[in-house]
Amino acid sequence: TAPRHTEVTLTSADGARIALPGSKATTDKPLRYCPRSEVGTGLRGAGPSSRQVNNYALGNDVETSHLLACEVLTPGGNWSSYPPHKHDEHTEVERVLEEIYYYQVRAGEGDAEGFALQRIYPSPGHDIDVCTEVRGGDVVVMPYGYHGPSVAAPGYDLYYLNVMAGPAEDSVWLMTDDPHHTWVRQTWEGQEVDPRLPMTPMND
């Protein structure tokens, strides 16, 4: 992260695909380089809801002005962003955060093009209803509403970059589950995490 009106140069000796998440900043935070070894990594869910989350600016000591960013890696056939949840009102347990998913899907046998499915549906006071196929390079904007699941088709591992921003100055991620589906979390206690995870190296 960098303060406003700061020029930053990015280089890679081996080449790279670089994503530059951004949002409107209202305060200046210290310039911060977060090497791979300091990225917060974790496994969420269990069984067919297993996925890996790499936190770049979410739940760690990277200071931002409104911006949150992480990436989610989901093995083919699994569901992520599940149970469905929302963050479209400001309360003690939730923050208003608009969200963008940028997707990449691992090709299958013979370079078969993979795909995934994304669901968004109404939350109280917010009318939205989306169920769409997504492929590599697609972006879905989630301004409000319950979102999830993100479903990786069997055989096609799913990646998405998750970028959020909202009006609150505290830059924290607080969300609430759809109460009809939050019970699903209890079922994870009796299931193993998918053995295909982690998909990238984990940090302690």
Question: What does each of the following model-derived ranges do?
Answer:
Residues 1-13, 23, 133-154:
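Conserved metal-binding segment of the jelly-roll/cupin
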Residues 6-8, 14-18, 66-70, 99:
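Generic beta-strand structural signal
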Residues 12-14, 20-24, 57-60, 70-76, ...:
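Short, structured patches in soluble enzyme cores that scaffold and shape functional sites
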Residues 16-58, 122, 154, 161-204:
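Double-stranded beta-helix
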Residues 29-34, 67-70, 79-87, 114-119, ...:
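A short secondary-structure junction signal
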Residues 52-100:
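A short glycine-rich, His/Asp/Glu-containing loop-to-beta-strand
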Residues 71-74, 93-125, 133, 141, ...:
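Short, conserved beta-strand element in jelly-roll/cupin
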Residues 107-110, 123-125, 146-149, 155-156, ...:
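Short Gly/Pro-enriched loop/turn and capping motifs at secondary-structure junctions
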